[in-house]
Amino acid sequence: MEELKALILSIQFMTGIPIPINIDVKEDKIYKIASYFPVVGLLIGGILYIAYLLLKDLFSREIVMTFLVAFSYILTRGMHIDGLADTFDGLFSNKDREKIIEIMKDSRLGTNGVLALVFMVILKILFLSDIRQSLLFSALLVSPVIARLSVVFSIAISKSARGGKGLGGLLLERAGLREFVIALLISTIAGYFVMPLKDLALLYVISLSFTCLISKYISKKIGGMTGDTLGAVNEFVELIAFIYFSIL
């Protein structure tokens, strides 16, 4: 029952998909939702593929992919792309640790954040449009899964830069190897049915290696990770997955 609660909470937390159920979970148990982030990715990927099937005969491929990228942000309430923008505003402000974190918490968007947001959206559309038709189903399902697996990996290898404040901080302080192993198992099962294992394994190596590097870089700058920087990891790895599928 605890695991089912964690699954529902992870969907409620990571998406705007309405689930009219009030889940009562103790604060010291809420970290378990991290295990099910890849399930959220699979759900989002499935919805995006259905949207693709509905739109593909109505518009050009580029327009359809633009709709899909926009719809993905609607599904997630812009949570991850907002984190990416805040991360760039903070990291490229050339300020000290405390000021960087303060800038990230600021709801106002700066020039660096706008540039990161715009380029991320454009690159996602371009590489998604470049993926072969035969690989599109796999790309739309697996990319959101791998992105969220990478977030769990970052959580497992990092600490909170804000002393455990906020849900992101709580996850960073409490979730660890157990949650990553469960997330990895879920991701592997999902990926096994839609792409060759050798291709999936290589995508794991690329994505998790990048996640390790960027997590260490950010942690060196601000002493850990935050909810915003985890969102940035999600965005970068999803783009990496799109690039990977466009090359296959």
From Swiss-Prot:
Signal peptide start-end: none
Subcellular location, principal: membrane
Transmembrane stretches, start-end: 3-23, 35-55, 63-83, 109-129, 135-155, 180-199, 200-219, 228-248
GO function term, MF aspect, one: adenosylcobinamide-GDP ribazoletransferase activity
Highest rank taxon of the organism: Bacteria
Reaction catalyzed: alpha-ribazole + adenosylcob(III)inamide-GDP = adenosylcob(III)alamin + GMP + H(+); alpha-ribazole 5'-phosphate + adenosylcob(III)inamide-GDP = adenosylcob(III)alamin 5'-phosphate + GMP + H(+)
Cofactors, names only: Mg(2+)
EC number of this enzyme: 2.7.8.26
InterPro entries named among the record's database cross-references: CobS (IPR003805)
GO cellular component terms listed in the entry, alphabetical order: plasma membrane
One record GO biological process: cobalamin biosynthetic process
Localization of this protein: Cell membrane
Keyword vocabulary terms for this entry: Cell membrane, Cobalamin biosynthesis, Magnesium, Membrane, Transferase, Transmembrane, Transmembrane helix
Membrane topology designation: Multi-pass membrane protein
Known pathway: Cofactor biosynthesis; adenosylcobalamin biosynthesis; adenosylcobalamin from cob(II)yrinate a,c-diamide: step 7/7
Sequence similarity: Belongs to the CobS family.
General function of this protein: Joins adenosylcobinamide-GDP and alpha-ribazole to generate adenosylcobalamin (Ado-cobalamin). Also synthesizes adenosylcobalamin 5'-phosphate from adenosylcobinamide-GDP and alpha-ribazole 5'-phosphate.
The protein's name: Adenosylcobinamide-GDP ribazoletransferase
Lineage: Bacteria, Bacillati, Bacillota, Clostridia, Thermoanaerobacterales
Gene transcribed to yield this protein: cobS
